[in-house]
């Protein structure tokens, strides 16, 4: 298991990636499906909540559960991105990067 402080540091980087993904979605404007927009908004909102939870979490199970929830939202965003077909390449890259970072963190915690 990674140390709680190491998880928090990694999460700070992931949160920046999620924020960049959200900004890319906004820049893409009307060219983004509602499904993808909703997935990105949920992930962005949940990451803000998760930051607070991770700051307070002391036990490994709470940290793991928080990361698992985020990774599941990352899966949903990736799936929505794939269903969207022809979307902005920068947005697609941001979604895939956020998904990959969340997946890596999850696997390191299990």
Can you describe what each PLM-predicted range is?
Residues 2, 27-34, 57-61, 79-89, ...:
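Surface-exposed, polar/charged faces of alpha-helical domains
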Residues 76-110:
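Amphipathic alpha-helical binding modules
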Residues 10-21, 39-46, 69, 73-76, ...:
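Amphipathic, well-ordered alpha-helical segments in soluble domains
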Residues 7, 11, 36, 40, ...:
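Hydrophobic packing residues in well-ordered alpha-helices of helical domains and bundles
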Residues 2-35:
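Short terminal alpha-helical segments
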Residues 25-72:
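Amphipathic alpha-helical interaction modules
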Residues 19, 56-59, 96, 103:
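Extended interaction regions within the primary functional domain
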